[in-house]
């Protein structure tokens, strides 16, 4: 509704829970929402916490930094559409070839031709997660933030910038 009734405001998911949907589902949702909003969509992602991940989604809450890294990498590969998706990581194996696999999964490429630069923001509270956001993402979503301590967050994010080719300026992050 907002996308159809506005033409300047940026629209996005506050934090789409990573355990609640596959990276492909998140990427296709982002591409569709970006198209419907005229290129104004921001994909916000986060892992949530162990209470929700294990209690609601029935998944172990282990290695959240690895989970976020792989998820963002996969989403970017899908929206960039450079080649069919192949990812063999610790959290995701795409196409799946593990126990119970039929062997029929093949590398796929999205048929959606969207904006390959959809911004990805991540919800990150811990210092290492904020550093990872600076490395991998286009912005940071803070659910609890002390406005008297922005230098704390800035220094964490800037450590991530040192590992990234994407960003170097905190003022545009």
Task: Label each PLM-derived region with a short phrase.
Residues 1-173:
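Active-site-adjacent structural elements that line small-molecule/cofactor binding pockets in enzymes
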């Amino acid at each position: 509704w907002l996308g159809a009734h506005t033409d300047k405001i940026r629209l996005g998911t506050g934090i789409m829970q990573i355990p609640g949907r596959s990276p492909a589902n998140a990427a296709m949702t982002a591409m569709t929402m970006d198209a419907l909003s005229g290129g104004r969509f921001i994909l916000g992602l986060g892992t949530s916490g162990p209470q929700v991940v294990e209690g609601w989604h029935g998944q172990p809450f282990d290695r959240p930094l690895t989970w976020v890294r792989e998820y963002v990498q996969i989403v970017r590969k899908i929206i960039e559409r450079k080649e069919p998706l192949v990812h063999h990581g610790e959290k995701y194996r795409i196409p799946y070839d593990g126990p119970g696999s039929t062997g029929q999964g093949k590398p796929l490429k999205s048929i959606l031709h969207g904006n390959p630069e959809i911004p990805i923001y991540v919800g990150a509270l811990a210092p290492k997660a904020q550093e990872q956001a600076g490395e991998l993402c286009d912005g940071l979503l803070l659910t609890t933030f002390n406005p008297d301590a922005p230098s704390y967050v800035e220094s964490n994010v800037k450590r991530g910038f040192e590992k990234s080719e994407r960003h170097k300026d905190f003022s545009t992050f």
